[in-house]
């Protein structure tokens, strides 16, 4: 367990450990899976980014991102996004197309992936959060509107 990956050295150590078969869990302050991948890659100098892309594409198992949303009954509840690495995700990472990962998450729900808007919608339907808070915490309010 790595508290937070803030430096290239920490990230490199984590990726190397994952490549050798160790389960590595860590935190990073980002809003979603594509931002997480971009933050990891962007922490390296330009001449090392292709290498970390390749390593990350083959060693990453998944990314769990959460946003804490105010509950109707008080307190907070997590709305989340879950990205599971597969061939499509690995290719997008290697090909510098992480901006397309949201589409893979939306189409990968049968594989167990969850996009933030579906998580928010389920919380609204369960009476846990208000629709207003769902829109406020969505990273794609127009996409949420299409689901409702």
For every predicted segment, state its role.
Residues 1-148:
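Short, flexible helix-loop junctions that flank or precede catalytic/ligand sites
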